Amino acid sequence: MSLTLAIDTSTDVRVGLAADGAVLASSAVTDPRAHAEQLMPLIDRTLADADRRLADVTQIVVGVGPGPFTGLRVGVVTAHTLGFVLGVPVRGVCSLDAGAAGHEAAGEFVVVSDARRREVYWARYAADGHRLAGPFVTPASELPDLPVTGPGAALAGGESTPLDGGLLALASPELPDMGLSPLYLRRPDAEVPTTRKSTLLQPRLAPGLAR
């Protein structure tokens, strides 16, 4: 049985385990400043809730945004590191695509997330969840006149919905593989000096988890 670990740090920190078309367990932390500190403990908790071990994972899927620089970097680097340690494939998926796949609609719609600075990340979708345009980052006032969904929908006059429903979609092989390059869409708020070695994102694995 294949076991997919799904990670998305484009908004909050969200983790899910999926097998045979069903989510076995999922967890989330809503503090946007705690991505680096919370991701590995959240993965451990989700595995425990599903009575699985990290060594049972057969593939990893990670949301590559769009989203903030630091949050996306945490998720993508952690997924890449775990994939290397476990020797399993890692796919990158547009986080908005996953949100669209979990949304029922009668016609075209827009998935929106908060980009801060009075802007939103968004993409336009057909009723079947196929992406028609985007992703973009613009003021909410520039969104097309279509129904909106997603965690930033309230910024456009809609009802915000978390991307929880997209975790199963994130693990679906039907979503296009975007690679592991994060979709920042704009430069980070703060630049890390190039001469300083980054200490971010070194997941600490318990002994015996590697093959």
Annotate the PLM regions.
Residues 61-89:
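DPxDG-like acidic metal-binding loop motif
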Residues 1-22, 34-37, 91-211:
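Oxyanion-binding and handling regions
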Residues 25-28:
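Short amphipathic
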Residues 39-41, 55, 181:
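Intrinsically disordered, low-complexity proline-rich regions
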Residues 43-59, 144-146:
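Phosphate/pyrophosphate-binding loops at sites that engage ATP/ADP/AMP, CoA/4′-phosphopantetheine
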Residues 35-50, 96:
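Short, well-ordered amphipathic alpha-helical segments that serve as non-catalytic structural scaffolds
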Residues 48-55, 83-93:
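Phosphate-handling active-site elements
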